[in-house]
Amino acid sequence: MEILRPIFGVALITAICAGPVPAADSSQADAKREERWQLIADYLFDDREVLPTDSLIKIDAPKRAQDAALVPITLTMPQKDKIKSVYLVIDDNPAPLAAHVTFGPAADSGTLQLRVRIDTYTNVHAVAETKDGKLFSTAAFVKASGGCSAPSGPSDAEAMKGMGEMRMKFAESIQQGKPAEATLMIRHPNFSGMQMNQLTRHFTPARYLEKMTVSYGDQTVLDIVGDISLSTNPVMGFNFVPRGDGPMKVVASDTKGGRWEQSFKVPPATN
């Protein structure tokens, strides 16, 4: 969608949504968070209506993150056949839109797992776009702090070692035509622009994965548009439907022109 490109940027989002919600009494804080969400939703979706749901999409997130730079998020879509794409929005992050994932014909859109950075106590919204163009959202509140400024490694050079290397893990048992699990791991520092180089004490310029495409054979599984809220060395769990021989191919690119691709042999499927 064309509306996505201008919003991927810390400065623009921060200008529109002026800072995280301050600590306050519960009712005041809830009202501030709802106001912030409405601003974000209006901007992201060009004033399209976003309806609440407890059935089309569900979000599983820790109430308190053990590591704010590596927060596991699981999205579940019980009515998966209706879902075209999902958006993951971390309301109080400097750039709230963490990822937009579009499901292709080789995907099973029942579940999606991501690791993200969370900068402060915040609502995390999951928005499902249905195939008829409607938007539905649900949210979870996560307590975390400092995830966007946490170092990606002991030094920038160390964090960039092996950049673009990929691994793919498949379920042990795969059957033709039935959903199968896969987990993609990509080495990349995903510099947020908010991290301080531990040696120079200067801020490291932003450099993050902005597009990833996963395909199986000649069909797309996932198209992923990302931003600074995806974690260092992103890990994504998803389901696909094996038909034919594959292989599974991943193409990834970042904001500094880096491009990587790799193909993976899928374990033989049984009938």
Go through each PLM region and give its residues.
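Short edge beta-strand/loop segments characteristic of extracellular beta-sandwich folds
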Residues: 60, 71-79, 181-189, 197-202
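Low-complexity, Pro/Ser/Thr- and charge-rich linker/hinge segments at domain boundaries
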Residues: 27-30, 145-167, 269-271
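Sec/Tat signal peptide C-region and signal peptidase I cleavage site
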Residues: 19-25
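Aromatic sugar-binding surface patches on proteins
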Residues: 105-113, 228-237
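Extracellular Ig-like/FN3 beta-sandwich strand-entry sites
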Residues: 119-123, 179, 243-247
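Beta-strand signatures of extracellular beta-sandwich domains
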Residues: 85-89, 211-215, 251
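N-terminal edge beta-strand
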Residues: 40-70, 158-179
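Short acidic/polar inter-strand loop motif in beta-rich domains
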Residues: 130-137, 253-262
